[in-house]
């Protein structure tokens, strides 16, 4: 199966208001990162993750302006495209991979690391490359 889209949320809240970001949230005491991803995915999108996998755990340095000492767990799963209703987090859109791979995109949240995570997932899962960024 060719996966050509990623579900992103256009955030309603700061930080990154009106910017696209992955689905996520904070770990509740006693939860594993995978358990958190399953819960957050369902709470925000009503999508049940079946086979979530941990890609990377990253701790932001203490001198990072936005996220000092924050731990980021990047977890992914493959799901069928389904409509997700707008809610308190924002508007959900299935965006083409090329949108994420655009190095000049100004409306993607964070440190523009989303495209790097997608590249790594493709390598791990041996997914054929079907995107090319052309200026």
Segments and roles (model prediction):
Residues 1-22, 49, 53, 78:
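N-terminal strand-loop-strand
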Residues 9, 55-57, 97:
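Conserved beta-strand termini and adjacent loop/short-helix elements that scaffold enzyme active sites
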Residues 14, 27, 57-62:
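Short, catalytically relevant binding-site loops at active-site mouths
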Residues 22-56:
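The catalytic Nudix box helix
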Residues 30-31, 108-111:
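Short, solvent-exposed loop/helix junctions and linker helices
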Residues 60-88, 93-100, 104, 111-125:
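Active-site-adjacent beta-strand/loop module that shapes the phosphate/pyrophosphate-binding cleft
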Residues 124-135:
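Acidic/histidine-enriched, glycine/proline-rich intrinsically disordered or flexible terminal extensions
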């Amino acid at each position: 199966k060719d996966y050509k889209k990623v579900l992103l949320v256009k955030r309603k809240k700061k930080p990154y208001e009106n910017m696209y970001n992955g689905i996520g949230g904070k770990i509740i005491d006693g939860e594993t990162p995978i358990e958190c991803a399953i819960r957050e995915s369902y709470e925000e999108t009503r999508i049940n993750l079946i086979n979530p996998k941990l890609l990377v755990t990253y701790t932001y340095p203490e001198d990072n302006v936005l996220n000092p000492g924050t731990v980021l767990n990047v977890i992914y799963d493959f799901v069928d495209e389904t409509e997700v209703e707008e809610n308190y987090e924002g508007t959900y859109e299935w965006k083409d991979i090329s949108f994420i791979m655009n190095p000049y995109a100004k409306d993607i949240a964070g440190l523009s690391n989303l495209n790097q995570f997608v590249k790594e997932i493709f390598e791990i899962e041996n997914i054929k490359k079907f995107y090319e960024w052309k200026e």
